[in-house]
């Protein structure tokens, strides 16, 4: 049974997540070579994090990209029909080229730095090879969307009647002088504004380390701990299995950063339980997908987006975590509200307590695994150490702490397997970050972000609300089919400057873009997380996507709330104001949930549902008058619903 379940999970991952379509070597020699290569990659990054080795920035990033490219061409076949049992002859050539690039960078580092982007012929050749390797690697892992975006941006950089390689002017606001191939490649290859830019810096440090941490935690049983705690706490309550799905997916999703992998991992367990107590196939799948997407919005790791956000904005990581916490929790609260209301409406009970794990026994068995998490929180927020150093020390502590009990004890083979899995798991994220570097590099070279900001503001007629709506649509379109990291970077590069120019706080603008880029995973027609959940539940994929939008509707409103009211992000506020804003936001989210479900204490008619929605929208703004009106509608709804519920009870008794 376990084997069958594993095969199903692998098939689902491969169907909806291209990065899972890896080679499976028959020859044990290839397997061993890949294992030792992966271990080398992991040990290098751990040594860098420890401070034992510290090459110059450009050298380190080129080594990181070179290693990741080498692993990409070793484990990812070129095409779906290509053999997964052996490495194709042309991949050996690509692997050799992947090694040559960082060697060239290492040997010629000082000369490249001295040229300051004025690339010579050899630089141009090496840079061209690097760009081609990155685009091909991204195509194999993420599909065509991300590489095509990168290619379009490169063509845009080359266009220009004055100096461009392509002597055609870009029309309107996007006009620029144009660049020749050597200038473009020099910018992308030989400085830290292109491929070796911010996104690769984050993947070579923060992302890699937290993936190692996640793999170690997974090996020592943290996944089972999360599941057992979630089902022990919530499984017996009304609609319990759905609440379990939310808790488990949220906890796991905050660490692993992949909505689809999260759906498959947690959904394989929770979706059948939801169906068993009476939730529909589509609703069960939607709960899993919306909760899994939310994991990327939930601190502390947020699918690694928090680290890139901190680097891009030049602020401390803990500021991102603090700001993102309340909106993410409110998002999950909105899902749980709908789960509770649906369970009450359809009279769906929880699971019998005698069938559930005992919370006390689970804590007794796994309590020590909370020590590394608490230590990580201390290192990130209070110690004064860098995030990199804190993550490295947490990894070491986790390995030691896991040995304290036999249930979590890891052998050397287990640790080795976690290190190998870490290197493999990093490949997809790192390649996406490298490819996104092309977009960032072209944007900085051509001034694209300034032009795009002007275009969005012009389209919105300088209206903040219209600009937010256009930005939302842009982010969701750009985020379709992309992993969370490139989706965030591309959307924030293209759309955030417009919001900032209108006076929105940079952090609020970045989070706004990030939220809607993530929601592309549950929004048809390319709702990959919803479709993966439908594959488990057996429901209709499109209907699952539509139900997912309904469940996540509060999440679509929350970004507007924190843009209009930065206090929700705990910016420029005190504790009392923060509590007030959080409470009014929760009230608004509950009104949305009741309106969507058409149920409170009893069924809600269409007129009352519209009134509830109006109350929720009134609570978006932080003005006292609108808050009082919104809360007034909430109180009136409680009063009216209780009267109607009592009346129904009397009629039923009669």
Predicted regions and their residues:
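Conserved, well-structured core domains of diverse proteins
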Residues: 1-117, 124-128
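Long, contiguous bundles of hydrophobic transmembrane helices that form the permeation core
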Residues: 2-32, 38, 322-425, 528-617, ...
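Membrane-water interface regions at transmembrane-helix termini and the short interhelical loops
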Residues: 49-53, 76-86, 111-112, 130-144, ...
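Membrane-interface helix termini and inter-helical loops of multi-pass transporters
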Residues: 52-56, 109-117, 186, 190, ...
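Membrane-interfacial loop-to-helix junctions in multi-pass transporters
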Residues: 121-125, 193-206, 232-245, 277-283, ...
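Core transmembrane alpha-helical segments of multi-pass membrane transporters/permeases
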Residues: 136, 141, 151-153, 160, ...
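Transmembrane alpha-helix interface/packing and boundary motifs in multi-pass membrane proteins
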Residues: 214-218, 249-258, 290-296, 381, ...
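Hydrophobic transmembrane alpha-helices that form the pore/transport pathway of multi-pass ion
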Residues: 227-295, 301, 305, 314, ...
């Amino acid at each position: 049974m376990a084997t069958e379940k594993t095969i199903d999970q692998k098939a689902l991952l491969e169907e909806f997540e291209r990065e899972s379509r890896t080679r499976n070597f028959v020859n044990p020699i290839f397997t061993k070579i890949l294992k030792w290569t992966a271990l080398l990659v992991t040990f290098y990054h751990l040594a860098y994090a420890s401070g034992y080795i510290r090459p110059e920035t450009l050298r380190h990033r080129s080594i990181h990209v070179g290693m990741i490219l080498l692993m990409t061409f070793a484990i990812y076949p070129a095409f779906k029909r290509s053999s997964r049992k052996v490495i194709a002859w042309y991949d050996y050539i690509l692997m050799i080229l992947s090694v040559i690039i960082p060697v060239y960078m290492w040997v010629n580092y000082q000369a490249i730095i001295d040229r300051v982007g004025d690339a010579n012929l050899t630089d141009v050749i090496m840079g061209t090879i690097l760009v081609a390797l990155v685009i091909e690697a991204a195509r194999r892992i993420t599909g065509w969307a991300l590489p095509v975006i990168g290619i379009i941006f490169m063509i845009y950089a080359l266009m220009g009647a004055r100096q461009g390689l392509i002597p055609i002017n870009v029309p309107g606001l996007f006009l620029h002088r144009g660049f020749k191939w050597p200038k473009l490649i020099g910018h992308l290859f030989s400085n830290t504004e292109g491929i070796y830019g911010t996104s690769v810096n984050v993947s070579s440090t923060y992302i890699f380390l937290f993936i190692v941490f996640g793999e170690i935690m997974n090996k020592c049983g943290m996944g089972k701990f999360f599941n057992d705690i979630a089902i022990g706490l919530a499984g017996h309550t009304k609609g319990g299995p759905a609440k379990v799905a939310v808790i488990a997916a949220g906890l796991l999703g905050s660490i692993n950063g992949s909505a689809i992998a999260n759906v498959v991992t947690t959904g394989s367990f929770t979706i059948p339980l939801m169906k068993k107590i009476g939730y529909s196939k589509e609703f069960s799948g939607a709960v899993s997908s919306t909760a899994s997407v939310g994991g990327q919005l939930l601190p502390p790791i947020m699918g690694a987006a928090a680290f890139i956000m901190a680097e891009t904005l030049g602020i401390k990581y803990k500021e991102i975590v603090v700001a993102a916490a309340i909106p993410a929790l409110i998002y999950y609260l909105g899902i749980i509200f709908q789960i509770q209301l649906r369970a009450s409406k359809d009279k769906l009970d929880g699971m019998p307590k005698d069938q559930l794990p005992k919370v006390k026994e689970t804590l007794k068995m796994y309590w020590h695994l909370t020590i590394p998490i608490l230590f990580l929180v201390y290192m990130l927020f209070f110690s004064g150490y860098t995030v990199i150093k804190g993550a490295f020390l947490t990894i070491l502590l986790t390995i030691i702490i896991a040995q304290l009990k036999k249930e979590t004890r890891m052998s050397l083979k287990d640790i080795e397997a976690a290190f190998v899995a870490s290197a493999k798991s990093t490949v997809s994220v790192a390649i996406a970050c490298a490819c996104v570097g092309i977009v960032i590099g072209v944007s900085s070279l051509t001034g694209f972000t300034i032009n795009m900001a002007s275009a969005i503001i012009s389209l919105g007629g300088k209206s903040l609300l219209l600009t937010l709506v256009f930005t939302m649509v842009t982010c969701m379109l750009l985020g379709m089919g992309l992993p969370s990291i490139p989706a965030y970077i591309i959307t924030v590069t293209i759309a955030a400057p417009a919001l900032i120019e209108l006076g929105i706080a940079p952090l609020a603008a970045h989070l706004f873009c990030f939220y809607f880029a993530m929601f592309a995973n549950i929004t048809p027609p390319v709702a990959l997380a919803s479709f993966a959940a439908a594959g488990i539940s057996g429901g209709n994929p499109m209907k699952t996507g539509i139900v997912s939008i309904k469940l996540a509707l509060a999440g679509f409103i929350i970004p507007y709330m924190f843009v209009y009211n930065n206090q929700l992000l705990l910016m420029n506020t005190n504790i009392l104001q923060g509590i007030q804003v959080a409470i009014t936001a929760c009230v608004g989210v509950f009104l949305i949930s009741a309106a969507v479900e058409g149920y409170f204490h009893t069924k809600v008619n269409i007129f009352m549902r519209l009134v509830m929605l109006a109350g929720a929208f009134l609570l978006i703004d932080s003005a006292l008058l609108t808050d009082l009106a919104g809360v007034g509608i909430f109180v009136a709804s409680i009063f009216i619903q209780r009267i109607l519920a009592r009346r129904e009870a009397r009629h039923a008794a009669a």
